[in-house]
Amino acid sequence: MPTPNIPSDFDFLDATLNLERLPVEELAELRKSEPIHWVDVPGGTGGFGDKGYWLVTKHADVKEVSRRSDVFGSSPDGAIPVWPQDMTREAVDLQRAVLLNMDAPQHTRLRKIISRGFTPRAIGRLEDELRSRAQKIAQTAAAQGAGDFVEQVSCELPLQAIAELLGVPQDDRDKLFRWSNEMTAGEDPEYADVDPAMSSFELISYAMKMAEERAVNPTEDIVTKLIEADIDGEKLSDDEFGFFVVMLAVAGNETTRNSITHGMIAFAQNPDQWELYKKERPETAADEIVRWATPVSAFQRTALEDVELGGVQIKKGQRVVMSYRSANFDEEVFEDPHTFNILRSPNPHVGFGGTGAHYCIGANLARMTINLIFNAIADNMPDLKPIGAPERLKSGWLNGIKHWQVDYTGAGKASVSGAPGTCPVAH
């Protein structure tokens, strides 16, 4: 049944719309009246060649699509649901080399190998080093007095965590930052002069060179673990490792840094929560920050056969877009979902991909990184205040902030609008 207040061609993945705001009210309307909604894209969709997609808005349905990898596949069209109009089908097909865009059995094999580097023990070994780095990041930024929170704070620890995990020299972290930005921000005018394909090629080449070096000189880092054969003879080839690093650079940098930025914006808008955090440092804060931010607004699957979802008939080959943003604010799952509550528990958000085979392999690393950097912010710049509005990334699927000017000392005049508990920044 069509939703009267939403035109059939209202495109929830429109990057221009998302530059200004997220479609919060429209998603809320769909959750109530048409939880699985067909979106017409009369002009066609770049890279896919179809004329629309199914948008899934309810928490339960998003989890069902995530769980049912037997009927909702990642391989046919990949996980990223929107590309620039000039994207070719051939370029989309190349994305299948990335773990995110694979189905079993290839996905099962690669994920088993990659999981070696993300065990609790492997992540735990990084904690002391990353805690020290988080403190240094916050202290360095605080000494500047004021600056761009994204560049000076929120991007730094995720980048350094990746560098530490992979054994990448810290001097090369800016390359990772640049490459990951250029690969994911093709629609944003700030990156209009870059070629995402070239950035991907440069990062893959860099990673393959790392793999070659570790094959000759093995160390204790994750690179060696992944390229050395286990007892079953399984290992990553150099090109498989290269594509894994592409995924890690995007997932580890873009999503975690955007969670950190949105989290600090939420604290600025909800000073009572910031005071609570500074006093108690609750472990539950990281998951609420991820829920609130939902840094990946949406991923997609493709129906592998005719299937019914939530009473709606979906045809084989149709794309099914999971709105993580909508699911994370589902009133049937979260009490007062539009209230930022760092003590929220339980918190079954889908910010790490819901459930199933594609659940975020680095979720524990992300939680640890978020906790460590906010502890460091609370220790070294407890009175931080915004002095400019956040500058959003133009993207149809990433909920990104490119720049945000703040006063680390708290001496400047705050300029983030909105009453506590509201969402004026369209996070």
Swiss-Prot record:
Matching InterPro entries: Cyt_P450, Cyt_P450_B, Cyt_P450_sf
Induction of synthesis:
By cholesterol.
Query: Which Gene3D superfamilies does the record match to this protein?
Result: Cytochrome P450 (1.10.630.10)
Q: Which cofactor does it need?
A: heme
Q: Which CDD domains match?
A: CYP142-like
Q: Which UniProt keywords apply?
A: Cholesterol metabolism, Heme, Iron, Lipid degradation, Lipid metabolism, Metal-binding, Monooxygenase, NAD, Oxidoreductase, Steroid metabolism, Sterol metabolism
The reaction(s) annotated as catalysed by this protein in its Swiss-Prot or TrEMBL entry are: cholest-4-en-3-one + 6 reduced [2Fe-2S]-[ferredoxin] + 3 O2 + 5 H(+) = (25S)-3-oxocholest-4-en-26-oate + 6 oxidized [2Fe-2S]-[ferredoxin] + 4 H2O
GO BP annotations, alphabetical order: cholesterol catabolic process
Query: Pfam families, alphabetically?
Result: p450 (PF00067)
Q: What is its EC number?
A: 1.14.15.29
What is seen without this gene? Cells lacking this gene show lower accumulation of 26-hydroxycholest-4-en-3-one and cholest-4-en-3-one-26-oate when compared with the wild-type and display a strong induction of cyp142A2. The levels of 26-hydroxycholest-4-en-3-one and cholest-4-on-3-one-26-oate are drastically reduced in cells lacking both cyp125A3 and cyp142A2.
Q: What class of enzyme is it?
A: oxidoreductase
Cite a single GO MF annotation: heme binding
> Where heme is bound, by residue?
360
Q: In which pathway does it act?
A: Steroid metabolism; cholesterol degradation
Q: Give the function comment from the record.
A: Involved in the utilization of cholesterol as the sole carbon and energy source by degrading the side chain. Primarily catalyzes the sequential oxidation of the terminal methyl of cholest-4-en-3-one into (25S)-26-hydroxycholest-4-en-3-one (alcohol), (25S)-26-oxocholest-4-en-3-one (aldehyde), to finally yield the carboxylic acid (25S)-3-oxocholest-4-en-26-oate. Also able to sequentially oxidize cholesterol itself, not only cholest-4-en-3-one.
The UniProt similarity line reads:
Belongs to the cytochrome P450 family.
Q: What is this protein called?
A: Steroid C26-monooxygenase
Which organism encodes this protein?
Answer: Mycolicibacterium smegmatis (strain ATCC 700084 / mc(2)155)
